[in-house]
């Protein structure tokens, strides 16, 4: 049986307590995983603290070289890492191999460039004073990463953190530990010094809590549920925070939209990554005049999506991360039907046509709930699975009101050919990101983050400075500015 240990100060550290990680498609035990706690966190933070001064003072060009080297190693191992990710998460192999793992490599390439642009600004004052700013690393950072796209999200945090001169302790979700372990190994192979990146496995209540509370941790970058994020900010003390939390993102489709493209994007945005994505367009608002036809075609296509073995390159929807999560998502489907929604595709039960080796897997068919009322729980609460809620709206004003009538505010999607309408809605919609006539297309230069219960702070490009860098002001006198003469 494979054993996954911690990576602390460049060493593979075994412990006494282990838990098992399983393949969500088959139930097969994949590995015994080290269960870290306060002792391992203390060791990892101490190692990161000791490594920080030398790493922070390494020339930017050298840090950039090491970032590129790590990105190259990921590129060289895409098939292996993708297979590992698919086995551990149930994500379809065509998504991990062709999109998610290559994107992880690009994170390091991108931030290798960003770290060489850590330029401050100068502010001359009346020819008598000169102010200038220094952009400096924070110190030891806690990186707490989720299970839905674990390798990509881990690198999305590790790359800017390390490139900007910080050291880190990465705590991956206990549901998806395998690729984080590989990342720790590849970082050392790339030549990143011991202690700069430490990977501690374990549960949130033990390893995660000890990490974010640690007094030597200066910044916390967390991606996960809103309740956990609130708890971290309540208990972890005065630190820098980046919190990317839950979402219930609206899709507004107006009658003048390019319906074919809107249909393509709406299906992709909710059902890709098994629907387990924070930016999923889970509330799809369709203008009344096109509602019946759009709903009919959406449901027909959802019924045709291929659910099955994540290792099959033709599979579009794989297995949900765990049996517990399957029960949660299935329960929401039942709740939606009880609340009065119309079930047009999918349903709360496992597919009946699965092959024998997948019968015990956490599979759900892509589910379409139509005629949803925005006050229903299925429209207000994050389901985090392949469940689309379809709702009609009358006009622009009602569409905007319904889109904003939710506690979350991460992503949003607008479909219309009316530029004036786009400009009004983009300003009025309560979300950190607005995508117009497109699915979620990420550019690493753009800020990523949400408003309201979807979190605080931004990451991406120079916006990653918010959590991973400190701005220091230096004020220099030219020598003859007036100084009050007290006590003369």
Language model feature labels by segment:
Residues 24-89, 289:
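N-terminal alpha-helical segment of soluble enzymes
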């Amino acid at each position: 049986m494979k054993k996954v240990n911690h990576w602390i100060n460049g060493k593979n550290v075994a412990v006494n307590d282990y838990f098992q990680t399983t393949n969500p498609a088959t139930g097969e035990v994949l590995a015994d995983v080290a269960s870290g706690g306060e002792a391992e966190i203390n060791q990892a933070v101490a190692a990161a603290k000791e490594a920080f001064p030398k790493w922070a003072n390494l020339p930017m060009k050298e840090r950039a070289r090491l970032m590129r080297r790590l990105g190259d190693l990921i590129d060289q191992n895409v098939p292996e890492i993708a297979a590992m990710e698919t086995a551990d998460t149930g994500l379809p192999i065509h998504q991990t191999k062709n999109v998610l793992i290559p994107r992880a490599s690009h994170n390091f390439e991108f931030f290798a460039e960003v770290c060489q642009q850590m330029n401050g600004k100068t502010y001359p004052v009346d020819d008598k004073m000169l102010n200038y700013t220094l952009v400096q690393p924070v110190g030891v950072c806690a990186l707490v990463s989720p299970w839905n796209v674990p390798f990509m999200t881990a690198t999305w945090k590790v790359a800017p953190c390390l490139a900007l001169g910080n050291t880190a302790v990465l705590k991956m979700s206990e549901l998806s530990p395998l690729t984080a372990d590989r990342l720790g190994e590849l970082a050392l192979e790339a030549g990143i010094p011991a202690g700069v990146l430490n990977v501690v496995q374990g549960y949130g209540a033990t390893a995660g809590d000890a990490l974010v509370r640690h007094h030597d941790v200066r910044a916390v970058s967390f991606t996960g549920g809103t309740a956990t994020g609130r708890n971290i900010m309540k208990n972890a003390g005065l630190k820098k925070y980046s919190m990317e939390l839950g979402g219930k993102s609206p899709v507004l489709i107006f009658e003048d939209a390019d319906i074919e493209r809107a249909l393509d994007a709406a299906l992709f945005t909710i059902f890709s990554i098994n629907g387990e994505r924070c930016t999923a367009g889970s509330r799809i608002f369709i203008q009344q005049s096109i509602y019946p036809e759009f709903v009919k075609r959406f449901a027909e296509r959802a019924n045709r999506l291929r659910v099955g073995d994540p290792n099959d390159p033709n599979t579009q929807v794989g297995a949900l991360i765990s049996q517990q999560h399957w029960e949660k998502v299935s329960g929401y489907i039942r709740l939606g039907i009880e609340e009065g929604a119309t079930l047009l595709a999918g349903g709360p039960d496992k597919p009946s046509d699965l092959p024998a080796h997948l019968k015990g897997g956490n599979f759900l068919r892509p589910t379409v709930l139509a005629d949803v009322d925005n006050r229903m729980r299925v429209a207000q609460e994050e389901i985090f699975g392949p469940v689309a809620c379809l709702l009609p709206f009358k006009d622009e004003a009602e569409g905007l009101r319904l889109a904003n009538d939710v506690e979350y505010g991460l992503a949003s999607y607008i479909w219309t050919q009316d530029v004036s309408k786009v400009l009004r809605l983009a300003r009025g919609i309560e979300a950190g990101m607005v995508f117009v006539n497109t699915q979620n297309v990420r550019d690493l230069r753009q800020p990523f983050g949400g408003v309201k219960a979807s979190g605080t702070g931004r990451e991406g490009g120079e916006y990653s400075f918010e959590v991973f860098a400190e701005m220091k002001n230096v004020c220099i006198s030219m020598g003859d500015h007036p100084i009050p003469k007290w006590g003369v």
